[in-house]
Amino acid sequence: MARIAGVNIPTNKRVTIGLRYIYGIGETKAEEICRRLEIPAERRVNELSDDEILKIRELIDSEYRVEGDLRREVAMNIKRLMDLGCYRGLRHRRGLPVRGQRTHTNARTRKGKAVAIAGKKKATR
């Protein structure tokens, strides 16, 4: 199992698929890395030589922000918005949708599980 950027890459998958296990590397960046290092896209991770793994590791470390650094940057951006007190920061602070979605109905992912209103019972006739 190859270890790149602190992540164990599955050995039986293709290189472009395996690189996507790293936070911050998606389909496009994985294909770009393979193209720049001239690694065939259909090659499996277990078929890579130690030299190729080292080249991948060096390229990712030098040119891409991944894993811990990227997570920290995203968290700091959100914290900055909250400290500014701007609209987006307030929405983050309150746990509501940030990008203008409706909240009267829906938005359950961001707001959490719906809680029934206690004490509101059906009136008997």
From Swiss-Prot:
<protein>
    <recommendedName>
        <fullName>Small ribosomal subunit protein uS13</fullName>
    </recommendedName>
</protein>
<dbReference type="GO" id="GO:0019843">
    <property type="term" value="F:rRNA binding"/>
</dbReference>
<dbReference type="InterPro" id="IPR027437">
    <property type="entry name" value="Rbsml_uS13_C"/>
</dbReference>
<dbReference type="GO" id="GO:0003735">
    <property type="term" value="F:structural constituent of ribosome"/>
</dbReference>
<keyword id="KW-0689">Ribosomal protein</keyword>
<dbReference type="InterPro" id="IPR001892">
    <property type="entry name" value="Ribosomal_uS13"/>
</dbReference>
<dbReference type="GO" id="GO:0000049">
    <property type="term" value="F:tRNA binding"/>
</dbReference>
<dbReference type="GO" id="GO:0015935">
    <property type="term" value="C:small ribosomal subunit"/>
</dbReference>
<keyword id="KW-0687">Ribonucleoprotein</keyword>
<dbReference type="InterPro" id="IPR019980">
    <property type="entry name" value="Ribosomal_uS13_bac-type"/>
</dbReference>
<dbReference type="GO" id="GO:0006412">
    <property type="term" value="P:translation"/>
</dbReference>
<dbReference type="Pfam" id="PF00416">
    <property type="entry name" value="Ribosomal_S13"/>
</dbReference>
<keyword id="KW-0820">tRNA-binding</keyword>
<dbReference type="InterPro" id="IPR018269">
    <property type="entry name" value="Ribosomal_uS13_CS"/>
</dbReference>
<comment type="subunit">
    <text>Part of the 30S ribosomal subunit. Forms a loose heterodimer with protein S19. Forms two bridges to the 50S subunit in the 70S ribosome.</text>
</comment>
<keyword id="KW-0699">rRNA-binding</keyword>
<dbReference type="InterPro" id="IPR010979">
    <property type="entry name" value="Ribosomal_uS13-like_H2TH"/>
</dbReference>
<dbReference type="GO" id="GO:0005829">
    <property type="term" value="C:cytosol"/>
</dbReference>
<keyword id="KW-0694">RNA-binding</keyword>
<comment type="function">
    <text>Located at the top of the head of the 30S subunit, it contacts several helices of the 16S rRNA. In the 70S ribosome it contacts the 23S rRNA (bridge B1a) and protein L5 of the 50S subunit (bridge B1b), connecting the 2 subunits; these bridges are implicated in subunit movement. Contacts the tRNAs in the A and P-sites.</text>
</comment>
<comment type="similarity">
    <text>Belongs to the universal ribosomal protein uS13 family.</text>
</comment>
